[in-house]
Amino acid sequence: MKDIVENDEIVLDTSGTECPIPVLKARKLAKELKNGDIIKVITTDPLAKADFEHYCLQSGFDFLESYYEGKKIIIKYKFKN
């Protein structure tokens, strides 16, 4: 499930999928994570920022940032267990 590790971040590319798939993939990935891991989600879903803010709040993770890289949205959060 882990796509790649880049700059000590675990990259999850969900480009081309829409709600709820990006968060569902992140939940599946969470089973493989350890405390303190930084996850970088790459998505094209315009609703993903709000979805991940809610997911992080619900799960006790730290939502770090979101920004655009061209047409893709980058979302970063810190996993806590």
What spans do the regions from the language model cover?
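An N-terminal amphipathic alpha-helical segment
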Residues: 1-33
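Intrinsic-disorder/low-complexity, polar/charged segments enriched in Ser/Thr/Lys/Arg/Asp/Glu/Gln
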Residues: 9, 36-40, 72-74
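Amphipathic, hydrophobic secondary-structure cores in small proteins
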Residues: 20, 25-62
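C-terminal structural segments of small proteins and small subunits
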Residues: 53-81
